[in-house]
Amino acid sequence: MHELLLFASVPSHQHHELLQQLTGLTAMQPRHCLERRLIFKATRKPDLANMRSGTGQGPDIVRLNKMLNGQMFYTQVVGPLSEADFDGKPSSSDSQDVSMSGTHEAAGSSYDYDSQPWRLEFRDTPEAGFRSTITARLAASAALPKGDVVPSMNAWGYSFVTEYVVEGDMFIYNDIVIFLHRVLQYPATGQEPHEPRRQLPSFRDLAPLEKTGSYILQAAITVQDGSNQELMRTASQHLFGLREQLKSAVRLEHADRLSLDTRAR
């Protein structure tokens, strides 16, 4: 499938006003989203056909494996979170007994790493020359087993690189998914952990990646058959229509292609 996108940077002071505007435009209340995003890098040509038990060989896996076609990319493994997963205050002994985990654990948190659901998301490098005013790229996703995904990812030819948290609000407007979000980083430690954290810090310990506190507005449409030019043209027109409706608030535009390059070198 193909994903068509437009993006805008939203200053922190404009965040609340834009939320209200999107609520009115879409006639829905925002759906708050929290996600863990684990980044993996291909260290050899992957073969997702050799998946371990628990994933199955469903159509999503078959399609994803065909799309990767033995090429090497960065991919992300995404897991939904709730605010309760971050509840609790760091204990006084955190600095001593959790230094190996790369972060302070949240005492009293309900988070259970072994029950964490995951999905593997692949996003290709945006197509060159599709349209100078829109971002288009191949996309695919597949469900993964709950819990520790590292052994499976390693077996498929991927190694863990880093992780972060995404916080935002989602709206649906006709066939457009609108996501107003920001990237949050874990507390700085002496060194980066070599595997995903099994416990999460207190939410207040997370820091925005963008120091100014700005947000990203992403508008996306998924087209199942990217070879159908009429569908692609219609989807593009819908995004341009949204851009026109929001032009007094934000400037939706395509992203720099190389800034979204997912190829592993």
UniProtKB/Swiss-Prot annotation:
Keywords, comma-separated and alphabetical: Activator, Nucleus, Transcription, Transcription regulation
First and last residue of the signal peptide: none
GO cellular component terms, A-Z: core mediator complex; mediator complex
Compositional bias annotation for Low complexity: 91-101
GO molecular function, one term: transcription coregulator activity
Database matches in InterPro entries: Mediator_Med18 (IPR019095)
Region spans: Disordered: 85-112
Keyword Nucleus on entry: yes
GO BP terms, alphabetized: positive regulation of transcription initiation by RNA polymerase II
Annotated S-S bridges: none
Gene3D superfamilies: Hypothetical Protein Pfu-838710-001
Localization (cell): Nucleus
Assembly behavior: Component of the Mediator complex.
Function description: Component of the Mediator complex, a coactivator involved in the regulated transcription of nearly all RNA polymerase II-dependent genes. Mediator functions as a bridge to convey information from gene-specific regulatory proteins to the basal RNA polymerase II transcription machinery. Mediator is recruited to promoters by direct interactions with regulatory proteins and serves as a scaffold for the assembly of a functional preinitiation complex with RNA polymerase II and the general transcription factors.
Name of the protein described by the UniProt record: Mediator of RNA polymerase II transcription subunit 18
Species for this entry: Emericella nidulans (strain FGSC A4 / ATCC 38163 / CBS 112.46 / NRRL 194 / M139) (Aspergillus nidulans)
